[in-house]
């Protein structure tokens, strides 16, 4: 029966690899300092206290010199490429932004101020006009402004079907000839136009009672003798406010609807 060594039952475990290396250290280590020193096991949670041991225990000339140049070189050389890249990117971005802003400002100037070539010939022309004509500069510009303000469709181009339909209120040509084309002219729609004796009021103008009263004043002997009735009617007509466009259009629509109902056959109520 084999007996176990006296150390094993007291410890109750097998020697670890560190202990075995410590026992055989004299075989592969030649320095007496390393043989006399016992290596402690590495602690995972605290790497700080382990770092100074190799630096202090190794040779004094080699330990301080080796880490310093590596740290200095790594601290100075690593940020250089990144900083250069960042600097170049910022510089390129600023240059591109400045170019785009310059292009945008030039475009805005061309849109709002116009091209310099177009503005150059206009300035001497404007300076030559008062020098040559003197006080007659305003009469020369007046016809151009008047032509731009008032564009007469009858003078420029012949009336199309839509324009004719709008001007004659959608009526047929035969009915317009019967009623009189002069009643549809723009002058007949004004409130200041005085009616002639024996004429019916145009559609959209004042009430028929005003026209009949003025006609009666003219035809009556008192009106023919002194003219007081016509003057009173004229003053009353002047005091009346002019007819608005909305009211005139409403009267025209009502008049057209009445004409359509008069021309068509009578309708029977379905109620």
UniProtKB/Swiss-Prot annotation:
Cited Pfam families: FAM110_C, FAM110_N
Ranges where the record places region Disordered: 1-83, 116-145, 186-245
Basic residues composition-biased segments: 68-78
Composition bias type Gly residues, residue spans: 220-231
Sequence ranges of Low complexity compositional bias: 116-126
Family designation: Belongs to the FAM110 family.
Protein name as annotated: Protein FAM110D
Species annotation: Homo sapiens (Human)
């Amino acid at each position: 029966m084999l007996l176990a060594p006296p150390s094993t039952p007291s410890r109750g475990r097998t020697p670890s690899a560190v202990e075995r290396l410590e026992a055989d250290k004299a075989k592969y280590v030649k320095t007496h300092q390393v043989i006399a020193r016992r290596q402690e096991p590495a602690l995972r949670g605290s790497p700080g206290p382990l770092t100074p041991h190799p630096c202090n225990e190794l040779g004094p000339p080699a330990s301080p010199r080796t880490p310093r140049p590596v740290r200095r070189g790594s601290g100075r050389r690593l940020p250089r490429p990144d900083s250069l890249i960042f600097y170049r990117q910022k510089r390129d971005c600023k240059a591109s932004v400045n170019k785009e802003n310059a292009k945008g400002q030039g475009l805005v100037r061309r849109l709002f101020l116009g091209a310099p070539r177009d503005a150059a010939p206009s300035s001497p022309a404007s300076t030559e006009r008062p020098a040559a004509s003197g006080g007659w500069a305003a009469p020369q510009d007046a016809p151009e402004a008047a032509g731009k303000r008032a564009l007469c469709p009858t003078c420029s181009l012949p009336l199309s079907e839509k324009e004719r339909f709008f001007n004659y209120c959608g009526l047929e040509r035969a009915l317009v000839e019967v009623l009189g084309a002069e009643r549809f002219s723009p002058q007949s729609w004004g409130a200041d136009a005085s009616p002639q004796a024996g004429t019916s009021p145009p559609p959209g103008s004042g009430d028929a009672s005003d026209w009949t009263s003025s006609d009666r004043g003219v035809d009556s002997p008192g009106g023919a003798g002194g003219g007081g009735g016509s003057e009173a009617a004229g003053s009353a007509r002047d005091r009346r406010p002019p007819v608005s466009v909305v009211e005139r259009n409403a009267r025209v629509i009502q008049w057209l609807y009445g004409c359509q109902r008069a021309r068509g056959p009578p309708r029977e109520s379905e109620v």
